[in-house]
Amino acid sequence: MSLKIKLVLIPLLCGLSLLSNAQTALADVTPQRSLPFMAGEWFQFRIHYGIFNASYATLELTKDSVNGIPVLHAKGYGTTTGLARWFFKVEDHYDTYFDEKKVIPYWFIRDIDEGGYTKNLEINFDHHKNLAHVKNLEKNEKKTYKIADNAQDLMSAFYYLRAYYPDHKLKPNETFSINMFFDYENYVFKMKYLGTEILSTKFGNVRCMKFRPYVQSERVFREQESVTLWITDDGNKIPIRLKADLVFGSIKVDLEKFKNLVAPFKIQFN
């Protein structure tokens, strides 16, 4: 995956794969508690590349149905802005339809245009047979792949992680993981817990949990521990900031706006 794609996907994906010492597997768990999100939730993220505002990304959650099954429909949109748009135009659309109780995806759509590089894919998930049916709309090709239990797509993973956050109190350096299927490949998504931190944001001081999402080895990143993610330590579990060190500079992603949260957004006053 190129740097161009990451400028838009980082706040949605927040990392991929590797290992650590302690590990909590989330792949076979079904949430029994109240979900930390609901239909109507909306986020806007601002992505900075150095001193420039490189792009914006939005996430919106609505109610829908797939084959008569009630689902939540997450719509993601990313675009370059300002000076960055003159050099490199990005228009990315992502949709996922996932079970509103089990938080597993049934249908995923990726329709992107990044400086002339285009891709238009649909993935239908059959979790009973552990299969993903991938349709390339540009090439009119269909392929089927074996997937792991409860495999997530790029978008549903964002909500799955929030819903499946470990019940027990995490210790520093402990990790948890889920299974993912993206484009034509299976991955393992892992995050290491680094502790809590009071983060200064545009909204005020916010108590956050600090994580290290593990990403695939690529030439863009200096090393595999180059990404840091902050998630609000409250009932919403919102990714509020992400930093990624690159070979040439760094990317910073900040939560810019939000609405329709499940729980109060907590600000620290001392």
Where does each model-flagged region fall?
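Hydrophobic, well-structured mid-protein blocks that either form specific transmembrane helices
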Residues: 121-165
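Hydrophobic h-region of N-terminal signal peptides that target proteins for export
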Residues: 13-20
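Acidic, serine/threonine-rich low-complexity disordered tracts
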Residues: 24-127, 166-270
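Bacterial N-terminal signal peptides that target proteins for export
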Residues: 1-9
